[in-house]
């Protein structure tokens, strides 16, 4: 058969350059500088929140986990846009009971759950 050749230029198929999207996930993680660096400006940060209470920080650190407050602090320091808290201790029967604690530090904190989803939107390019 016939073969047609046509050169396509990037401007014909690409939009204006824009910042990409980032999702940062880490489980079984205590706060550390590397995690903060990786989470910088994340569109969605998904964090360990095994322990609920601030007085459990030493226990969390000992076992390589985080508290709700520590994860919220990390999200704030990293300038993340959203935070989903996950990996709850079996002792936490209703994570929503502790959500306000995290939201007082980082208002965009939410409790994650199986099947939770989100559609992240690109930011429009600035002229």
Question: In which residue ranges do the predicted regions lie?
Answer:
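Cap/insert and terminal regions of metallo-dependent hydrolase folds
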Residues: 7-117
């Amino acid at each position: 058969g016939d073969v047609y050749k046509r050169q396509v230029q990037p401007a014909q198929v690409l939009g204006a350059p824009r910042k990409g999207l980032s999702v940062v996930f880490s489980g079984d993680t205590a706060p550390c500088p590397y995690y903060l660096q990786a989470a910088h400006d994340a569109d969605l940060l998904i964090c360990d929140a095994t322990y609920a209470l601030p007085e459990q920080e030493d226990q969390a650190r000992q076992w390589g986990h985080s508290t709700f407050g520590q994860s919220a602090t990390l999200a704030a320091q990293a300038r993340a846009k959203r935070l989903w808290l996950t990996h709850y201790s079996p002792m936490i029967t209703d994570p929503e009971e502790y959500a306000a604690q995290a939201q007082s530090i980082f208002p965009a904190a939410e409790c994650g759950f199986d099947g939770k989803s989100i559609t992240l939107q690109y930011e429009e390019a600035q002229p």
